[in-house]
């Protein structure tokens, strides 16, 4: 049993030009590419992203990679909570992470910043604690957005300790809300796609609008709001990476750095997990198409 995370239709080159399905199947242990040859119109209609299936097939080696030649495949109807069990899970239980998030929110002593953060997290809590942080590359698993945020908050702790001039309230608030726009950018927690709003606007602009709207709803105005908006808008660090402005305050620079560190280290972790000791991983797109080496130690 597995969940379909990707499916495309192809045509064979022969005279009959029959249809086939390229399917990527996933369970909690990983993914495998699969082929369903001579797919019927009903199968093409039936098998889609997010569908849980039960089947069997033969595992073959294709260009050095494992591939499954599907012999039989049938859909299973289950709810989203059960579907989530087929996805990679975070290394920390969700309930533990939820308590950690609450602890960090309470570290924000600036009442205006706290009100905005609390208001947005409360309003979008279910999505925030269940959505992945991305559809691929980094933290692309159940509750990945929450886990990514907490890892960043722990990195923020260390920067605040070393660089005592940083505004801890602003940095904590920026970390917690930096990806809040992803609760609207993605379609849901299970095998998410980009929403229309997500594709057209993007999570940075969405998140900025959410902060601005919450501040207006709470009748909060002034420099703190501008600074928090700046944190959201600049957190990708460069305009070519999607930020309309560059970091102009140290807290925004710190946010950019720790976001990048955590995302990239997660990509290294994923690559090592799927690689045998003493060998190299496949090329990692998010790491400039590098191959990652896994030592024998």
Q: Which residue ranges define each predicted feature?
A:
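Divalent metal-coordination and catalytic microenvironments
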Residues: 2, 50, 152, 259
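N-terminal intrinsically disordered, cationic/polar leader segments
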Residues: 256, 280-288, 295-297
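Short, acidic/hydrophobic/Gly-rich beta-strand patch recurrent on exposed beta strands
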Residues: 22-27, 188
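Active-site flanking loop/helix segments enriched in acidic
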Residues: 126-147, 191-195
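OB-fold single-stranded nucleic acid-binding module
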Residues: 7-19, 30-85
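Helix-hairpin-helix/helix-loop-helix acidic hairpins
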Residues: 150-153, 160
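Extended, charge-rich, solvent-exposed interface segments
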Residues: 67-132, 206
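Divalent metal-dependent catalytic cores for phosphoryl transfer on phosphate-bearing substrates
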Residues: 137-138, 158-275
């Amino acid at each position: 049993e597995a969940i379909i995370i990707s499916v495309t239709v192809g045509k064979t080159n022969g005279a009959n030009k029959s249809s086939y399905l390229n399917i990527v199947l996933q369970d909690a242990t990983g993914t495998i590419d699969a082929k369903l040859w001579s797919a019927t119109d009903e199968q093409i209609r039936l098998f889609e992203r997010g569908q849980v299936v039960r089947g069997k097939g033969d595992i073959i080696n294709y260009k050095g990679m494992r591939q499954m030649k599907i012999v039989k495949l049938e859909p299973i109807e289950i709810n989203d909570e059960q579907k989530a069990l087929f996805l990679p899970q975070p290394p920390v239980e969700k309930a533990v992470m939820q308590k950690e998030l609450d602890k960090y929110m309470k570290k924000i002593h600036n009442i205006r910043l706290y009100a905005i953060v609390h208001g947005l997290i409360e309003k979008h809590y279910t999505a925030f604690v269940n959505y992945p942080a991305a559809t691929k590359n980094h933290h692309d698993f159940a509750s990945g957005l929450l886990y990514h945020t907490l890892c960043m908050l722990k990195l923020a702790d260390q920067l605040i300790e070393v660089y005592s001039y940083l505004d801890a309230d602003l940095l904590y608030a920026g970390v917690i809300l930096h990806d809040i726009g992803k609760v609207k950018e993605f379609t849901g927690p299970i095998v998410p796609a980009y929403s229309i709003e997500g594709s057209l606007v993007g999570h940075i602009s969405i998140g900025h609008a959410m902060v601005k709207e919450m501040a207006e709803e709470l009748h909060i105005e002034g420099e703190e709001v501008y600074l928090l908006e700046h944190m959201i808008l600049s957190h990708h660090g460069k305009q070519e990476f999607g930020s309309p402005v560059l970091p102009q305050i140290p807290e925004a620079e710190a946010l950019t750095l720790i976001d990048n560190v955590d995302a990239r280290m997660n990509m290294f972790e994923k690559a090592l997990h799927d690689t045998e000791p003493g060998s190299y991983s496949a090329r990692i797109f998010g790491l400039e198409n590098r191959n990652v080496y896994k030592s024998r130690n």
